[in-house]
A protein has these predicted regions:
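Conserved alpha/beta-domain cores
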Residues: 2-8, 25-30, 37-39, 47, ...
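Flexible inter-domain linker/hinge segments
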Residues: 1-19
């Protein structure tokens, strides 16, 4: 309904230090070498992640927080064993964004017998030792997994309370927020309004958003997701949201940032490298044509190509003509991609390998050329669950084009076959526990699918 948020004349002011965000490079904060390389990559923005690309474990969190604090003060280093030297952060104006864990997660063990908001705990850990005078980069936060404008009000209150406790100006903490849940797509303007003293932009977190779309359409037999890697980046359920996000952000003076291109370049496979960079260029060119102001990447070799697709530091002055104010944001993916047994098999193999990485302390893993984190795991778990729900009238085919029934037996067989192959692929001389960990990864993944776990865990 109309409100001050949607009808008022309010505007957001983007500070000079972050007006150019044509590429934001992202990666887990607990890897000091990766953090230094991202900060030295030349990307105008870097997002240091305590959330989906980092396994949610206490040692990782402590390393990640320490690395972010050292990055903000310009003191972070790592030891380059190959060259026998210490590598630090080059002096630059790169904007550093710290992604804390979302409000869907809690932290135990802080207060005896109680649980604490993981978001609040991460923020408190980060800012407690920080002295504003020692910061080489402004303190800025990436907000994940929000579902409503009410959450934005909570974040605004927290930012102001922290600033008051630290003796900082009330608007000292700046932020961007990810639109990666379907409900938030309907409250983007209200979300910006609640955080207008702090927020500088919104980001389309498209892989988590895809998972959220499956979740919200899980029981709709007319809304079944095709194989993920057959879905084009400009599929209507993404493109309509891109157009709306840009229109709202630019009307209010905020940046609009595009999503991650998951296919990574390779320095050892020329064919994969060429395909990955061509995919990147096409993807970012589409986002630039929608008048987005930048996008995400995760590999240094992607930076120059990503930046080159955006014609100027930002496109805040530009808006697409005739953008619907209330578009259909849930168009069914009909006539898009394909639904195949191969897609289910790829999903099964990926969720096992991803969960195996988590059990080894890795929140993101390079799998078959794609950098996969929790968002991919969610998509594939939900995709398999959705195909099981609609097995009776789902047109799914095998590699020879023959129709299949996507039932529990097919999925169980897929897990057994994938597990056998993954165990066979383990290297000679492996750790004796590696096979057991793979079995545990498969067990956990199957249990999540069977129990319909949809939340980002």
């Amino acid at each position: 309904p109309p409100s001050q948020a949607t009808t008022g004349a309010w505007r957001i002011t983007v500070p000079e230090w972050c007006r150019d965000q044509r590429n934001q490079m992202t990666g887990p904060a607990d890897d000091a070498e990766l953090v230094v390389k991202m900060l030295n990559s030349g990307a105008p923005g870097v997002m240091l992640d305590l959330e989906d690309s980092m396994a949610n474990a206490w040692p990782n969190l402590m390393r990640g927080v320490a690395n972010i604090q050292a990055a903000l003060t310009g003191t972070l280093t790592y030891e380059d064993a190959k060259r026998g030297r210490t590598v630090g952060i080059s002096t630059s104006q790169v904007a550093i964004w710290s992604r804390v864990r979302g409000l869907h997660l809690s932290q135990a063990g802080v207060i005896p017998g109680e649980i604490t908001s993981a978001s609040l705990f991460d923020l408190a850990l980060l800012v407690h030792p920080l002295d504003a005078a020692s910061l080489k980069h402004p303190f800025a936060v990436y907000i994940p997994k929000s579902e409503s404008a009410e959450e934005a009000r909570w974040w605004a209150d927290v930012f102001k309370a922290i600033a008051a406790a630290k003796g900082w100006p009330s608007d000292f903490i700046r932020c961007m927020a990810l639109v990666e849940s379907h409900p938030l797509a309907y409250q983007m303007e209200e979300f910006l309004h609640e955080l207008r003293d702090h927020i500088v932009g919104l980001n389309l977190g498209r892989w988590d958003y895809m998972a959220s779309l499956i979740h919200w359409n899980l029981r709709d037999p007319h809304w079944v997701l095709p194989d993920r890697n057959t879905i084009p980046h400009d599929v209507p359920f993404f493109q309509r949201l891109r157009h709306l996000l840009v229109d709202i952000c630019h009307r209010r003076g905020a940046l609009a940032i595009g999503g991650m291109t998951a296919l990574y370049p390779s320095r050892t496979d020329a064919e994969l490298n060429a395909r990955a960079l061509a995919t990147l260029e096409k993807d970012k060119r589409n986002e630039a044509a929608c008048f987005m102001d930048g996008a995400w990447t995760g590999h240094p070799d992607q930076n120059a190509i990503a930046v080159a697709q955006f014609p100027e530091p930002n496109q805040l002055h530009a808006r697409l003509p005739d953008v619907e104010r209330y578009p259909d944001l849930r168009p069914a993916p009909i006539g898009v991609g394909s639904i195949t047994l191969g897609g289910t098999r790829a999903a099964v193999r990926t969720v096992i390998r991803y969960r195996n990485g988590v059990l080894h302390g890795r929140g993101a893993s390079l799998l078959d050329g794609y950098m996969e984190d929790l968002a991919t795991d969610r998509i594939y778990r939900l995709m398999i669950a959705q195909r099981l729900l609609h097995r009776d009238h789902l047109a799914i085919v095998d590699g020879d084009g023959h129709p299949m029934v996507h039932d529990d037996a097919l999925v169980a067989r897929g897990f057994d076959e994938a597990l056998t192959m993954l165990v066979a692929e383990l290297p000679i001389g492996r750790d004796p526990g590696d096979e057991d960990t793979l079995h545990e990864a498969a067990r956990q993944s199957r249990l999540m699918i069977e129990n319909g776990f949809c939340d980002p865990i």
